[in-house]
């Protein structure tokens, strides 16, 4: 787990920091917290990480796709009990889970793993 602490002014900047945190967590996991060298498949995956990340703008959400799976959804504008920038776990490929946000890319200070957003504690 990596804690993303940066506050951002734009959703695009926030998504960039979130995915950088996820990539850093992948490197941490692949190198056993830095105890071994990054090699083979893991080295290849980190090299392709940024090019494998796609941002898809929707009506209410920005969908962040890593390779072929949805990494998370980002709320574009305030609605219901969600704020602009809230990170939502994917319920499926086309919809987020609306139970609770996993953090906010604009406010920072949220945990992230290479597998996706974590619950706030």
Where are these regions (language model features)?
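An almost-null, non-specific background feature
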Residues: 20, 24-31, 35, 73, ...
């Amino acid at each position: 787990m990596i804690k993303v602490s940066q506050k951002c002014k734009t959703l695009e900047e926030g998504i960039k920091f979130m995915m950088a945190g996820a990539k850093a967590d992948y490197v941490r996991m692949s190198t056993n917290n830095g105890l071994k060298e990054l090699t083979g498949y893991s080295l290849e995956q980190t090299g392709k990480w940024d090019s494998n990340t796609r941002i898809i703008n929707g009506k209410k959400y920005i969908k962040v796709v890593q390779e072929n799976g949805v990494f998370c959804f980002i709320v574009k504008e305030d609605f219901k009990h969600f704020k602009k920038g809230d990170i939502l776990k994917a319920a499926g490929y086309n919809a987020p889970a609306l139970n609770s946000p996993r953090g906010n890319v604009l406010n920072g200070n949220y945990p992230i793993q290479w597998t996706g957003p974590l619950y706030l504690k």
